[in-house]
Amino acid sequence: MLLQGALLLLLALPSHGEDNMEDPPLPKGACAGWMAGIPGHPGHNGTPGRDGRDGTPGEKGEKGDPGLVGPKGDTGETGITGIEGPRGFPGTPGRKGEPGESAYVYRSAFSVGLERQVTVPNVPIRFTKIFYNQQNHYDGTTGKFLCNIPGLYYFSYHITVYLKDVKVSLYKNDKALLFTHDQFQDKNVDQASGSVLLYLEKGDQVWLQVYEGENHNGVYADNVNDSTFTGFLLYHNIVE
């Protein structure tokens, strides 16, 4: 340490030579005998440099997780109607409905026959053999059907013809509407028949009778041959 201090002192003294003489060069190299000074403190940080240029694109990263579901979009325009699909399977049966109101059934019918040969022409034929007359709309004492229910009726008759020709008419309220003529063939039993649809009002009467006298009164009946008269209501015309 004493030697180092002496050297520093000698260096600080002025030279006794000429003023223009250069100072002798300092020794070079680590082997010159000089010792390094104490390291100084670190300097202040410099100002940040400018942004560098963009680097080259990196490799494609891995697929990310799905994002959150976005809000519902606006309703789109109606599309074109598609083709008709196949027929579906039958549905399950529905519940049983409640009972409906009962409908009243209007009935009017009769079917009658002769018990013996007709002897009197030009009057209603009295059919007294009753097959059906539950409503009693046919009167066996007069031979006439009396309409109690307005509506459409069907009437028919089948006459056994024997011994004479037959001319029979169906009457409605004293007016002949239907005519049947059958000529008797000797020793043979024949049949004559007719049928008609009639609309009747309440109070109308319908019957059969022989017309044009005794020579056309071959209406016949016995225990094996019948002559019949039938009528019944097809549908009523009652406003409820």
Swiss-Prot record:
Domain C1q residue range list: 103-240
A single GO molecular function term of this UniProt record: signaling receptor binding
Biased composition range(s): Basic and acidic residues: 50-65
SUPFAM superfamilies: TNF-like
Residue(s) at site: Not hydroxylated: P57, P66, P71, P90, P99
Modified residues (4-hydroxyproline): P39, P42, P48, P86
Leader sequence residues: 1-17
Keyword Disulfide bond belongs to the record: yes
Notes on activation and inhibition: Polymerization and secretion of adiponectin is inhibited by succination of cysteine residues by the Krebs cycle intermediate fumarate, which leads to S-(2-succinyl)cysteine residues.
Chain positions with 5-hydroxylysine modification: K28, K60, K63, K72, K96
Listed GO biological process terms: brown fat cell differentiation; cellular response to insulin stimulus; cellular response to xenobiotic stimulus; detection of oxidative stress; fatty acid beta-oxidation; fatty acid oxidation; glucose homeostasis; glucose metabolic process
Post-translational modification: HMW complexes are more extensively glycosylated than smaller oligomers. Hydroxylation and glycosylation of the lysine residues within the collagen-like domain of adiponectin seem to be critically involved in regulating the formation and/or secretion of HMW complexes and consequently contribute to the insulin-sensitizing activity of adiponectin in hepatocytes.
Keyword line: Collagen, Disulfide bond, Glycoprotein, Hormone, Hydroxylation, Repeat, Secreted, Signal
Region (Disordered) residue spans: 29-100
Modified residues annotated as S-(2-succinyl)cysteine in this record: C31
Compartments in which it is found: Secreted
GO cellular component: cell periphery; cell surface; collagen trimer; endoplasmic reticulum; extracellular space; perinuclear region of cytoplasm
Gene3D superfamilies tied to this protein: 2.60.120.40
Complexes and interactors: Homomultimer. Forms trimers, hexamers and 12- to 18-mers. The trimers (low molecular weight complexes / LMW) are assembled via non-covalent interactions of the collagen-like domains in a triple helix and hydrophobic interactions within the globular C1q domain. Several trimers can associate to form disulfide-linked hexamers (middle molecular weight complexes / MMW) and larger complexes (higher molecular weight / HMW). The HMW-complex assembly is also modulated by the degree of lysine hydroxylation and glycosylation.
Purpose: Important adipokine involved in the control of fat metabolism and insulin sensitivity, with direct anti-diabetic, anti-atherogenic and anti-inflammatory activities. Stimulates AMPK phosphorylation and activation in the liver and the skeletal muscle, enhancing glucose utilization and fatty-acid combustion. Antagonizes TNF-alpha by negatively regulating its expression in various tissues such as liver and macrophages, and also by counteracting its effects. Inhibits endothelial NF-kappa-B signaling through a cAMP-dependent pathway.
Other notes: HMW-complex blood contents are higher in females than in males, are increased in males by castration and decreased again upon subsequent testosterone treatment, which blocks HMW-complex secretion.
Protein name as catalogued: Adiponectin
Source species: Bos taurus
